[in-house]
Amino acid sequence: MLAIFNIYLDNAFHLNGIILAKLPEAYAIFDPIVDVMPIIPVFFFLLAFVWQASVSFR
């Protein structure tokens, strides 16, 4: 069990490095878009509540 947890932690640390990596210089113009992209699914989640409120939570 402990070995599985250690593997999980090792993978989590490696993924953090990938997420925080910078884009290559050629794609630097897309930095603002890439910064907003992880938030887009949250907007869809909130849109579901707005939609339900507009139809009175049927």
Curated annotation (Swiss-Prot):
GO terms for biological process: photosynthesis. Its main location: plastid. GO terms for cellular component: chloroplast thylakoid membrane; photosystem II reaction center. Residues 1-21 form a propeptide. It is a single-pass membrane protein. The chain crosses the membrane at residues 29-49. Keywords: Chloroplast, Membrane, Photosynthesis, Photosystem II, Plastid, Reaction center, Thylakoid, Transmembrane, Transmembrane helix. It holds the Pfam family PsbK. It is found in: Plastid, Chloroplast thylakoid membrane. InterPro entries: PSII_PsbK, PSII_PsbK_sf. PSII is composed of 1 copy each of membrane proteins PsbA, PsbB, PsbC, PsbD, PsbE, PsbF, PsbH, PsbI, PsbJ, PsbK, PsbL, PsbM, PsbT, PsbX, PsbY, PsbZ, Psb30/Ycf12, at least 3 peripheral proteins of the oxygen-evolving complex and a large number of cofactors. It forms dimeric complexes. HAMAP family: PSII_PsbK (MF_00441). One of the components of the core complex of photosystem II (PSII). PSII is a light-driven water:plastoquinone oxidoreductase that uses light energy to abstract electrons from H(2)O, generating O(2) and a proton gradient subsequently used for ATP formation. It consists of a core antenna complex that captures photons, and an electron transfer chain that converts photonic excitation into a charge separation. Belongs to the PsbK family. This is Photosystem II reaction center protein K. It comes from Physcomitrium patens (Spreading-leaved earth moss). The gene is psbK.
